[in-house]
Amino acid sequence: MVLRTRIKELRARHGLTQEELARMVGVRRETILFLEKGKYNPSLKLACKITLALQASIDEIFIFEEEDLK
Protein backbone atom coordinates (compact mmCIF):
# COMPACT_ATOMS: atom_id res chain seq x y z
CA MET A 1 0.00 0.00 0.00
CA VAL A 2 1.11 3.50 -0.85
CA LEU A 3 -0.26 6.52 0.99
CA ARG A 4 -1.01 9.55 -1.15
CA THR A 5 -2.34 12.79 0.33
CA ARG A 6 -4.24 15.85 -0.80
CA ILE A 7 -2.75 17.97 2.00
CA LYS A 8 -1.00 20.42 -0.33
CA GLU A 9 -4.14 20.97 -2.42
CA LEU A 10 -6.42 21.41 0.61
CA ARG A 11 -3.88 23.57 2.45
CA ALA A 12 -3.69 25.90 -0.57
CA ARG A 13 -7.49 26.01 -0.79
CA HIS A 14 -7.54 27.30 2.80
CA GLY A 15 -4.76 29.80 2.08
CA LEU A 16 -2.39 28.18 4.58
CA THR A 17 1.38 27.90 4.36
CA GLN A 18 3.16 24.74 5.45
CA GLU A 19 4.35 26.64 8.53
CA GLU A 20 0.82 27.72 9.47
CA LEU A 21 -0.62 24.23 9.08
CA ALA A 22 2.31 22.79 11.04
CA ARG A 23 1.66 25.21 13.89
CA MET A 24 -2.06 24.36 13.88
CA VAL A 25 -1.41 20.62 14.24
CA GLY A 26 1.66 20.84 16.50
CA VAL A 27 4.44 19.60 14.21
CA ARG A 28 7.43 21.07 12.37
CA ARG A 29 7.07 22.47 8.85
CA GLU A 30 9.30 19.66 7.57
CA THR A 31 6.73 17.11 8.73
CA ILE A 32 4.09 18.77 6.55
CA LEU A 33 6.57 18.84 3.65
CA PHE A 34 7.29 15.10 4.04
CA LEU A 35 3.56 14.33 4.28
CA GLU A 36 2.87 16.28 1.10
CA LYS A 37 5.65 14.43 -0.73
CA GLY A 38 4.44 11.04 0.51
CA LYS A 39 7.61 10.40 2.49
CA TYR A 40 6.00 10.18 5.93
CA ASN A 41 3.03 8.24 7.28
CA PRO A 42 1.27 10.18 10.04
CA SER A 43 0.07 8.75 13.30
CA LEU A 44 -3.69 8.46 13.71
CA LYS A 45 -3.58 11.37 16.16
CA LEU A 46 -1.78 13.62 13.65
CA ALA A 47 -4.09 12.54 10.82
CA CYS A 48 -7.09 13.54 12.95
CA LYS A 49 -5.55 16.93 13.75
CA ILE A 50 -4.96 17.52 10.04
CA THR A 51 -8.58 16.66 9.22
CA LEU A 52 -9.78 19.21 11.76
CA ALA A 53 -7.39 21.90 10.51
CA LEU A 54 -8.31 21.34 6.85
CA GLN A 55 -12.02 20.74 7.57
CA ALA A 56 -12.05 17.52 5.56
CA SER A 57 -12.57 13.84 6.28
CA ILE A 58 -9.75 11.30 6.54
CA ASP A 59 -10.70 9.72 3.21
CA GLU A 60 -10.75 13.12 1.50
CA ILE A 61 -7.16 13.80 2.60
CA PHE A 62 -5.47 10.40 2.71
CA ILE A 63 -5.70 7.97 -0.22
CA PHE A 64 -4.35 4.44 0.01
CA GLU A 65 -3.29 2.90 -3.30
CA GLU A 66 -2.02 -0.55 -4.16
CA GLU A 67 1.64 -0.66 -5.17
CA ASP A 68 2.35 -1.73 -8.72
CA LEU A 69 4.69 -4.70 -8.29
CA LYS A 70 5.82 -4.97 -11.91
Task: Name the predicted role of every residue range.
Residues 63-70:
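Short, charged recognition helix plus adjacent turn
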Residues 5, 15-16, 42-45:
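Residue-level signal for the short linker/turn that defines the boundary of a DNA-recognition helix
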Residues 16-34:
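Short alpha-helical DNA-recognition segment
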Residues 12, 23, 52:
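Alpha-helical residues within the helix-turn-helix
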Residues 1-13:
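A short, Lys/Arg-rich alpha-helix, primarily the initiator
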Residues 45-60:
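DNA major-groove recognition helix of helix-turn-helix/homeodomain DNA-binding modules
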Residues 12, 26, 37, 66:
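Residue-level detection of the helix-turn-helix DNA-binding "recognition helix"
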